[in-house]
């Protein structure tokens, strides 16, 4: 019932929803992986939800695609594609993740996990660890290096965190205290088909977060860090305290 182009109408819909419903959390879903291609509005939807959540001072949760649906033209995402959905959501400031399936879930019972159960378990653990580190911080920007998708923003020239290597398909999610400069960045490999190595530089000594153990370590290059990222994977770095 809202008017305007797709973006304006959806922004107004979100504004009205928040005003009328007064939710404690914004939860939405967007299914990106089609049978033979990918959608073209995933980052647009993610950016608009992020914008609405920030304006309202609310956390948001992304319910991500975790199954196929032949009748609707969806393919079932593999491990790398689910990792891509998880880390792109995290870089845009999501506070939570849900996995949408039509059937019984990722396991029928404790003795019958499907092929995605253990990889997703590890990814959820890493999401929780990184999201916990970012809980007291604000999402200050989500920037695309290389090709900028519909709804995305290019990395500003004056960004505190930059890529040292030639342009790669990398997403930088910047976090810090509200109205301050970024101190943390989530670095995501946007290629879910192949691993990559990228070097990120910052304005001072950097530290890298090891999500499985929830520990920080000094970057060997002080104000630069080389990251080996799996397909669709990401890492959290910060300025040394």
Task: Go through each PLM region and give its residues.
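Glycan-processing catalytic domains of CAZymes
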Residues: 1-205, 210-241
